[in-house]
């Protein structure tokens, strides 16, 4: 059986999701660190133009998109499952919501002054001279990826983010995982 090779970078939340799932399923894997921003000539050549992170390589096969990667890993190692039998559809719906709505609300906060200082400077109080250029370069790169995508204005995104975090907290009331006694793809996506 071919090795699992995860192409990723350390600070990517979608990469972290897949790294955690690989650990949860106790799958051996190899790591290839890729650039955060363009140009990524090796990545684009290998993926046929896909530039997002992460992607999974198994032999000559390349799997792009973390939702697809979850399905591939589930097929390769069915236990422990990411999709509890009685909640498979719900797990997928919550994971998709987290990957889309929760993620973009969180990103709006990450590009606020305190969020960017934390993300690029290591502390919400880091001076802008320490992180400003990195944040601008990263933000410009991500803007090219988001062309045509609807975005919430920053104040609306902050309100939505707080609301989403309250909902997740409510779901965790009295239990350790979002959908019950064991982790599911929903937990890894919301993490």
Model-derived features: where do they sit?
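GST-like fold's C-terminal all-alpha helical module
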Residues: 102-191
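GST-like domain detector, emphasizing the conserved glutathione-binding G-site
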Residues: 1-132, 153, 178
């Amino acid at each position: 059986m071919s090795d699992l090779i995860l192409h990723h970078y350390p600070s990517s939340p979608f990469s972290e999701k897949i790294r955690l799932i690989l650990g949860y399923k106790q799958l051996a894997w190899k790591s290839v660190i890729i650039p955060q921003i363009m140009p990524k000539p090796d990545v684009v050549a290998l993926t046929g133009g896909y530039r997002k992170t992460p992607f999974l390589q198994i032999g000559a096969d390349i799997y792009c998109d973390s939702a697809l990667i979850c399905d591939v890993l589930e097929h390769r190692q069915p236990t422990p499952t990411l999709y509890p039998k009685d909640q498979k559809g719900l797990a997928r719906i919550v994971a998709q919501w987290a990957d889309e709505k929760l993620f973009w609300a969180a990103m709006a906060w990450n590009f606020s002054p305190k969020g960017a200082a934390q993300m690029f400077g290591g502390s919400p109080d880091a001076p802008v001279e320490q992180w400003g250029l990195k944040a601008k370069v990263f933000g410009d790169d991500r803007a090219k990826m988001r062309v045509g995508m609807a975005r919430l204005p920053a104040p609306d995104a902050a309100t939505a983010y707080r609301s989403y975090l309250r909902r997740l907290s409510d779901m965790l009331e009295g239990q350790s995982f979002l959908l019950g006694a064991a982790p599911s793809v929903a937990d890894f996506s919301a993490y």
